């Protein structure tokens, strides 16, 4: 085996790391000492086992692979240490050559032979004979002839990817996977206009004139065009340097499957396509307000987005990703530049780059070439960049970076900044909040929330209520955490923010501080339970109450919110919905139960343990 360790498939590395991680500490250190002779570096990698979700064997192999270690060296070391089970995992994998010829003929297969040339010639002849409007593109089954060979069987496919979709003529708005997508129904209509000829596309874009080009990407260029007085956006696909033959066709099939099978209010719909001999193109509606990236930094003389509009856009993004994940579809290209805004500033998630189903059904993820996504590295987790394992976690992490961009006003990547990536700036704040013994039991999410609220919240868009800041930052931390990241939990956090800000649309932003409570510099009488102990679901519940539009999200227990009975803590949620009480009885004695600080901290940790955000060792540890 002459290949390097970093060329091993992800499923092989997963099985190998799980096997070696189960070794005793003595056996593992013996294996690692042959790989790393520097004891300082070895101890650094060994200390990573305390971090949740980190495989120290994978970190060790990653360090070794960066030194050009080969698979043969790894197998020899495993056999020398008599770790035959781990060696068998590597030996059971055999690189599959791209050519179907026997192994001795592999050197000849490097050059294009007569067989490959004849196949290409046959394919060109078929393209010439093919009619201008092929009937296979008008069926509701496979989108192209090659798509039938790639898509999974009907038993394995999700409901939205199956061919037989129920007709629902009465439904005028498609947002779930139970009804037939609108674009998919259009394919079966006689005389539909979904298929565009090359002449139509050339005429609409004036032969892809440079003055019509909107943006330039890795896989395609976007042009603006017009047909019958209607503006369209044309995505002209192109071959990527170093890609395999036919990659453009596979990319076209994948994006068409995703757009046609997923009909959602926050996913950019497909209006047409063109599969000609000169170029391949996808046609979408033209988004008048550009992308979220442009509006965040006021590019193109656009106005600054206010907080209510920002919350609505982020909620729409999370709804789109949650819908795709419910269909087992991974977008893998979530970033602010791909969140397009229509004339009403409604978000539309666009430009997916992944296949609508995993290529490897055994491991349930797709191995992708990371060098094709270097431009999007600012939105990708470090684990994906290293290993190449594409899961739903990648989309959720990218959503967290977009939410952080909107909240902080800091670009995801800035070459003139240190660190360059916003994700490194946020994650670097976590160790600063883990210095004391008590804070070691605090989850990573709370540390991120505190740092974001104190240092990085955007000020140019106006004042944001403190409770909204915490809920928004909580949504960011939920997406960025390595274990149990949940797009649904982040959406619930933002739902409360959106509901609260929507009720304040009639108020000038200069008066928001008056409507949301006293200033942080004003002395305030409080009890021993601070606002940080309140959970995010309580924010959502209070924001949905009728009186929450004009009252603070978190009702205080001090002079501004005096108590008139001994059941104040039990009825705190109802007080938030009914509004503040009159201060006429503020001098009366307030009977309240004082909770021991250690007991309160234990109760909070038990809640985190039930949510699987805290290990038992951290719950009952020192």
From Swiss-Prot:
CDD domains per UniProt: Death_IRAK2
Swiss-Prot/TrEMBL keywords: ATP-binding, Nucleotide-binding
Recorded GO MF terms: ATP binding; protein heterodimerization activity; protein homodimerization activity; protein kinase activity; signaling adaptor activity
Hydrolase as UniProt keyword: no
Residues reported to bind ATP: 214-222, 235, 335-338
Domain Protein kinase: 208-473
Keyword Oxidoreductase annotated: no
Pfam family, one: Pkinase
Bias (Polar residues): 513-523, 561-590
GO biological process terms held by the UniProt record: canonical NF-kappaB signal transduction; interleukin-1-mediated signaling pathway; lipopolysaccharide-mediated signaling pathway; negative regulation of canonical NF-kappaB signal transduction; regulation of cytokine-mediated signaling pathway; toll-like receptor 4 signaling pathway
Similarity comment text for this entry: Belongs to the protein kinase superfamily. TKL Ser/Thr protein kinase family. Pelle subfamily.
Subunit structure: Interacts with MYD88. IL-1 stimulation leads to the formation of a signaling complex which dissociates from the IL-1 receptor following the binding of PELI1.
Job of this protein: Binds to the IL-1 type I receptor following IL-1 engagement, triggering intracellular signaling cascades leading to transcriptional up-regulation and mRNA stabilization.
Description of its domains: The protein kinase domain is predicted to be catalytically inactive.
Official protein name in the record: Interleukin-1 receptor-associated kinase-like 2
Gene source species: Mus musculus
Gene: Irak2
